[in-house]
Amino acid sequence: MSPERARQGTTALHDGGPAAGAGTTEQTPPAGRPGAPVPSVLSLPAPAVLAALESSPRGLTAAEAAARRARHGPNELPAASHGHVWRRLLAQFTDLFAVVLLVSSAITFLAYWLERPREPATLQLAVAILGVVLLNAAIGFAQEYSAERTAESLQAMVPHICRVLRDGERRELSARDLVPGDVVVLEAGDAVPADCRLVEAQEAAVNNAALTGESDPVTRIAEPVPPGPPLEARNCVFMGTDLVAGTGKAVVLATGTATEFGRIFRLTAAAPRQRTPLQRQVAVMARRVAGVALATGALLFAVRVPSGQPFVDTFVFALGVMVALVPEGLPATLSVSLAIGVRRMARRQALVKQLLAVEALGSTSVICTDKTGTLTQAEMTVVQLWADGVPHAVSGVGYAPDGEVADPAPVRELLRTAALCSNARLVRTAGRDAWRVLGDTTEGALLVAAVKAGLDPAEEESRAPRVAEYPFDSERKLMSTVHRDGDGTYFACAKGAPLELLTRCEAVDRGDGRKPLTDAGRRGVIAAADGMAGRGLRVLAVARRQVSGPRPPISDVESELTLLGLAGMYDPPRPEVRDAVDACRRAGIRIVMVTGDHPLTAEAVARRVGIVRETAPAVATGTELDAMDDSGLDALLTGARELLLCRVTPEHKMRVVTALQRRGEVVAVTGDGANDAPALKHADIGVAMGASGTDVAREAAVMVLLDDSFASITTAVGLGRSVYRNIRKFLIYLFSHNIAELVPILAATFTGFPLVPITAVQILAIDLGSDVLPALALGAEPMEPDVMTSPPRPRRERLFSTAVMGRILFLGGIQALGVCAVFFWHVHASGIPYADFTRDTPVYREAITMVQAGIVVSQFFNALAVRTDRQSVFRAGLLSNPWLLAAGFFGIGLMAAISYAPPLQAVFRTAPLAPADWAVLAAFGALLLAAEELRKWTLRRRSPAPKGGRP
């Protein structure tokens, strides 16, 4: 049998291959894969597995490995493709606003070419519009490119190096050079570089959390096993997982995308990337604004052509109206505002890879969170010991041996025995004041407790070296070791599940000697163990006995034992998580735990962090989800106030996310393993762990938590809500002045005035000069105190809600009335007939200058007014956003330069204003602010402030 055929058969286990069912010895390769049916490698002995893959205990030859490398390709997943740089740059010009402006610029260039004589103002307009598009595209591209580069700096393919047998020699190779048939050497602490079948195993255990979400170590053996689900095959190890205990040799079955990791990668690639709420709202807004602009321009063109105006002039006029209605500064303002949110989140340890995801966080209504590493510290910790009927508290959290054991003398022998009966190692991270465990985390927790009691595990091991080991297995639920004491005698150490170990004990250590274990004593031990388990602790019993020699039968080692006591441990919650969960409740955000762990473990953690408060929360396993149709799942998600989903697969997570989205929820999903990646990509907001997360998870997510803390999500949600509020503020600010630009043009058209009250170049000066900085300052408004006490906004809520449109019309209407008044007052006061006005008439130039200055001054007061929705701006503090004041004064200063500087007067056809003119405009702006304050006061009187929060 060729190795390629063997590989194709064995790597399709999840597709119903050799592990698909009992009694199956052959399989048909999946569609599109070459190869004939092959025997299941799960049920073959090790020599037959090597033979099936045309390998040997000496590994492959270098020549054969090179041939297979050419055939199968590198052992890596395809790099994420963000597209060529130029394509992403061109994508910036596909926005509807950009398309409308590009077309407008092109038509204006054409109009300038057709004009006789050619007007410099027309060319200025065409160039200015094109410049707007280029500026917006540059800002948007720069922000996205910067975020991508930052995210890519986190990527680290693990493992880079592995040990492999080639030509009978052990070599260190890059993991990407592995091929099917290679024999790899694994030791505790190694990351598994490919999907492999073990051919040798000594006390091997793996952590499959990256694939299954289950954080408990799983024993692995080299013996044949019956066909079954691939991830449950006890003689296989998989890419992306870690060997936490023991050693072994394994033959590579699958590499790259043919691995289980690759299967999840393909599932992730097939999952559609959801558009954020803001993307949907901006798209709707762009279509509507573009439609209104085109319709208005066409209407005015149709009205003015019959009046005898030159065709080209009328066409340019209609384009000017369209330009007046399109908020040219909006894309740049939106991009920079979101970028400010990105920077604020990054300072809080949340890296956002896509700008638009910032706002989407603010609309999150459901968070589907995993458990280990996000809610907890992923560091098992012994918190209670029990010996001779007395509990002993253990202080300190995590792997750092900081803390102490209350009254350590009675439990020293318990902890010494537990430390000897362990394969884990406690090491300090180089260059950092941090500790980590190499090996099983449960054994690591016992080592830390031993150090806290004043013991040195390495010294104890040297005093009583191990001479034999009887590994843990799922039937005995025990692990035992034999040691030689300093006087030449031998003793056995055992640890395991309390009930199983208790049946093998005949005595108990009372501190003053070995006493018989009576029925009452057994009941006391069971009660103590049940009490610890009821608190959500994982409980182990520890025992020992004298033995006759270095390698006695296991029946002698694990009988007539003396019970030393119990150890209770747990993975402690992150200290900040409970407050973060409470903040989510106040904000009306529902939290659903979705984990691969056991239901009892999940519920215990959920209670500690405050996710569960009810006596009987709803708990569903992956098997139960499989039995539900969509209506049943909808009923579960709707009816359960507190919900825990346990023992779930990647497919289950995607189905749950889809069901929640179907109900109108905006869903954020957290995860760190490859098994989380499909749901991370399918969610509205995928949140991956930066420190402990896999590359696949980080690539699928749009936000990466650099500190792996759930509390950072809550902070990011608050910042996201603040960003949305700020976006709404500057939208009101920008669109209200569009009304002030459009209404005078309409008024002039329908009253027969031959010229426009404000030119297109003046409009661009306002949109891109005077208005941009105040809009940016509004986008940088600090987070308001009540931002996390309101319910999430509905998924289908329009960006331009009735309330927002009402404020735009209210403020824009006041501005429009004011600038119309000053324009027509100047025109009528001159006594010049409408027909005699030309572009160079001094009164006309003064009038259009008053219109432009009126909009600029009123926008300064408008910016102050929109800072708050209900609260008086005077209560919020006029000086609380100094950037806004500076931006407003800059805009007024720019307007003054346009009015008084001769070069700018020539460009904008303006005239100098008298001090009295400025006073009139300032009074008009103050009137606008007073009117908005009166509106807010009326709103506060009529209705109390809304309050949110879910129970």
State where each predicted segment sits:
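Helix-coil boundary and interhelical linker segments in multi-pass alpha-helical membrane proteins
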Residues: T749-T759, W825-A847
